[in-house]
């Protein structure tokens, strides 16, 4: 009878022991690994103070845009500006009729268009909340390295231009 062959029984025991040892070794190695830290912040269960607020850039100098159709950034303080359904403090300077007296740049004519491209007498409701697209700038260091290249740096360079 085959099932009573002692060498076969020994072989089955060896394979079982080998499988158990393999599971034990792999399980301990998997449990011993630590999860890599993606940031230097403490564990979420610890109470920590908030980082200080960044210093806003409020030099009133218009910044160059980084790409076509980028909304201009806000070069002045908007602290305390009321922006609600009933009031928009930005319009007191940037509305088309008031820019001559305020010296502020006029908002784009696209802000007076509805979704169908029809011109309106007043700012389109979908463009009324300025800070949805336009943001003030803060004096901070980048969170990640930036390898951005301006479009002019990516364009064609004639042979022999030395660049």
From Swiss-Prot:
GO terms for molecular function: metal ion binding. GO terms for biological process: anaerobic respiration. It is found in: Periplasm. Residues 1-32 form the signal peptide. Heme c 1 binds at residues 76, 90, 93-94. Heme c 2 binds at residues 111, 130, 133-134. One of its GO terms (cellular component) is periplasmic space. The keyword Cell inner membrane does not apply. The keyword Electron transport applies. Binds 2 heme C groups per subunit. Pfam families: NapB. Keywords: Electron transport, Heme, Iron, Metal-binding, Periplasm, Signal, Transport. InterPro entries: Multihaem_cyt_sf, NapB. Belongs to the NapB family. Electron transfer subunit of the periplasmic nitrate reductase complex NapAB. Receives electrons from the membrane-anchored tetraheme c-type NapC protein and transfers these to NapA subunit, thus allowing electron flow between membrane and periplasm. Essential for periplasmic nitrate reduction with nitrate as the terminal electron acceptor. Component of the periplasmic nitrate reductase NapAB complex composed of NapA and NapB. This is Periplasmic nitrate reductase, electron transfer subunit.
């Amino acid at each position: 009878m085959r099932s009573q062959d002692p060498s076969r029984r020994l072989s089955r025991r060896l394979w079982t022991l080998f499988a158990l040892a393999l599971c034990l070794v792999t399980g301990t190695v998997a449990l011993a690994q630590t999860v890599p830290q993606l940031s230097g912040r403490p564990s979420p269960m610890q109470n920590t103070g908030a980082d200080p607020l960044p210093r806003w850039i409020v030099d009133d100098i218009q910044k160059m845009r980084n790409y076509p159709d980028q909304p201009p950034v806000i070069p002045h303080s908007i602290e305390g500006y009321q922006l609600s359904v009933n009031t928009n403090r930005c319009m007191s300077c940037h509305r088309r009729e008031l820019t001559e007296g305020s010296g502020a740049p006029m908002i784009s004519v696209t802000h007076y268009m509805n979704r169908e491209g029809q011109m309106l007498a007043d700012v389109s409701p979908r463009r009324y909340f300025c800070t949805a697209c336009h943001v003030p700038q803060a004096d901070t260091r980048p969170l990640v390295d930036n390898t951005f290249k301006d479009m002019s740096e990516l364009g064609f360079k004639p042979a022999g231009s030395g660049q």
